[in-house]
Amino acid sequence: MSRITSMLVTHKKASISEIENAWHGDVEALLKWVSSHDTVEECAVLKTCNRVEIYVVSPRGEKVLFEIAKKARVSSRIIDIHDHDESLLHLLRLASGLESMIIGEDQILGQMKELYRTAKSLGYTGWVLDTAFKKAIQVGKRVRKETAINERSVSVGSAAVDLAEQILGGLEGKSVLVIGAGETGELISKALVSKNIGSLYVTNRTFGTALSLAASLGGTAVPYEEMKRKIREADVVISATSAPHYILLKDDIERAMEGRKNKLLIIDIANPRDVDEAVREIEGVELHNIDSLKQISDENMRLRMREIERVEAIIEEELELLRAKYKRREAEELLARIYSEAEKIKEQEVRRAMNKLSAYHTLGEIEQKVLMDMSHSIVNKIFAEPTKALKSAAERGNTEMLRYAMELFRLNQEESD
């Protein structure tokens, strides 16, 4: 059984700009590129604002991933390469929210489901990755049901609202413009409404989407072409679009600040970023991006240490079950190869016996069936105890016994041929 190898570029080692630059195309293009490598049997990609993670099932997984990093010009300084067991642990921790910038956030679980569904629907995953991702998603759900890991502001969107509240000393009566009405924009808008703000404005490229979200929350939808004018009236702008380029330049914000006395807070949580960094130079404007949210992450970490211990206990329990499943599969594949070889020998010897008997008299159907049944029974009985022993060895993690079995039946020679 080929195993999982993964390459991670995340907020732990990389800045937001380095994560942005790790891969410029969409997920489908990245999947196609990764799968084009000869030895890649399965692959999946997780790409969010805080991470680009590539999972491959390949006998040469590490080599393939280093080649991909080299071609994409990703510095080895910001890369983590995980082997099979490390990848399984990481996936379970990721789905549980322990690897997120905001510990325990719910958004990552939805993103994992969606990105896994994309890879599976396009035919890039098989049993090995399906098993890992299904278990990770199941564990993510269990953790949120049995612990309080996600009971505070845990999504990036919620953290952006908390940051705004912290900077301004409260959001009561404030006018807030949310740019982007997708999943993150919706999370932001809902979090804002709970803060008793004065006015909520929502804008989106597709006006109908903005209209629907604003109407559901008692806010006002703003046509996208009027967005820059509406900034003049806002105390806070939170941007979370999926645009591949800046949507707000320095000139745009300078015009919005003309004749304005009160300050403007802009929080850009998009990846790639929505707001030009040069906006920081404008007097009266305070710009924050995802990097600023690390403050919120640190605070949540302190408050959730007790829950993290409970989550890790669940992960440890589920990881053992997952590892056992892979070990059983490994033993089953080995046994299938042994039985396949035995079947070939059985058929050869039965044919030889039939040919010898046919020299003396014509064999009837019943006689042929008796010979076939007998040979089948002999094979099964000979391998009954070795089968149990190999399955037991696999579940105990006794890889040496599996290796000896491969050598004994000369199966390792087939792999090297």
Swiss-Prot record:
Q: How does it assemble?
A: Homodimer.
- Marked site positions, Important for activity: 90
EC number(s) per UniProt? 1.2.1.70
One Pfam family from the record: Shikimate_DH
Q: In which pathway does it act?
A: Porphyrin-containing compound metabolism; protoporphyrin-IX biosynthesis; 5-aminolevulinate from L-glutamyl-tRNA(Glu): step 1/2
Among Gene3D superfamilies, the record links this protein to:
Glutamyl-tRNA reductase, N-terminal domain, NAD(P)-binding Rossmann-like Domain
Q: Which GO terms describe its molecular function?
A: glutamyl-tRNA reductase activity; NADP binding
A single Gene Ontology biological process assigned to it is:
protoporphyrinogen IX biosynthetic process from glutamate
This chain belongs to the protein called: Glutamyl-tRNA reductase
Written domain comment of the UniProt record: Possesses an unusual extended V-shaped dimeric structure with each monomer consisting of three distinct domains arranged along a curved 'spinal' alpha-helix. The N-terminal catalytic domain specifically recognizes the glutamate moiety of the substrate. The second domain is the NADPH-binding domain, and the third C-terminal domain is responsible for dimerization.
From which organism does this entry originate? Methanothrix thermoacetophila (strain DSM 6194 / JCM 14653 / NBRC 101360 / PT) (Methanosaeta thermophila)
* Active site, UniProt feature: 49 (nucleophile)
Q: Which family does it belong to?
A: Belongs to the glutamyl-tRNA reductase family.
Q: What class of enzyme is it?
A: oxidoreductase
What this protein catalyses is: (S)-4-amino-5-oxopentanoate + tRNA(Glu) + NADP(+) = L-glutamyl-tRNA(Glu) + NADPH + H(+)
Would I find Nucleus among this entry's keywords? no
PANTHER family named in the record = GLUTAMYL-TRNA REDUCTASE (PTHR43013:SF1)
Extra remark? During catalysis, the active site Cys acts as a nucleophile attacking the alpha-carbonyl group of tRNA-bound glutamate with the formation of a thioester intermediate between enzyme and glutamate, and the concomitant release of tRNA(Glu). The thioester intermediate is finally reduced by direct hydride transfer from NADPH, to form the product GSA.
Q: Where does NADP(+) bind?
A: 180-185
Sequence positions that bind substrate: 48-51, 100, 105-107, 111
Which InterPro entries is this protein grouped with? Answer: 4pyrrol_synth_GluRdtase, 4pyrrol_synth_GluRdtase_dimer, 4pyrrol_synth_GluRdtase_N, GluRdtase_CS, GluRdtase_dimer_dom_sf, GluRdtase_N_sf, NAD(P)-bd_dom_sf, Shikm_DH/Glu-tRNA_Rdtase
Function, as annotated, reads: Catalyzes the NADPH-dependent reduction of glutamyl-tRNA(Glu) to glutamate 1-semialdehyde (GSA).
Q: Which UniProt keywords are present, listed alphabetically?
A: NADP, Oxidoreductase, Porphyrin biosynthesis
Q: What is the top-level taxon of the source organism?
A: Archaea
